[in-house]
Regions:
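Axial heme c-ligation environment in periplasmic c-type cytochrome domains
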Residues: 23-25, 84-93, 108-126
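Gly/Gly-Pro-rich "capping" loops immediately C-terminal to redox-active cysteine motifs
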Residues: 50-52, 74-110
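Electrostatic cytochrome c docking/interface patches
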Residues: 27-65
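Flexible gly/pro/ser-rich segments immediately N-terminal to CXXCH heme-c attachment motifs
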Residues: 64-68, 95-98, 121-125
Length: 126
């Protein structure tokens, strides 16, 4: 099974949200997130990844910057999902985070989020 780093990071971010961009919290919108554009609409996590300990462990290493020092989600979002940088989304807000589909995770991690500090990561994750 080919594991793409982007998929693992998206999975790790989402898994962290279910289980549970300095200092101040980002304002949270109350409506549902926008749908992913067409080029991301068919992006989904492979079957079985949500329960695969090896995949989750690799995702954790990517999320925390262990596998690649140029990619460290936790530097903004915190190791436990609590933001450590201004403007970072609080991943501990499970009800909000459950609204994000796999395709939205792929899109936002790949392309970043306009008008925020969340940059595009697709050049660092494949």
């Amino acid at each position: 099974m080919k594991i793409t780093r982007l998929a693992v990071v998206a999975l790790m971010g989402f898994a962290g949200l279910l289980l549970s961009g300095c200092g101040e919290e980002a304002p949270e919108s109350t409506g549902p997130p926008p749908p992913a554009p067409a080029e991301y609409a068919d992006k989904h996590m492979p079957a079985g990844w949500w329960a695969d300990e090896k995949i989750l462990a690799e995702g954790k290493e990517i999320f925390e910057g262990v596998k690649n020092i140029d990619v460290n989600c936790a530097s903004c979002h915190g190791k436990d999902g609590k933001p450590v940088k201004a403007g970072a989304r609080d991943f501990r807000k499970g009800e909000r985070m459950k609204q994000y589909s796999d395709s939205v995770w792929f899109w936002r991690i790949s392309e970043g989020v306009p008008n925020t500090k969340m940059k595009a990561w697709k050049s660092k994750l494949s």
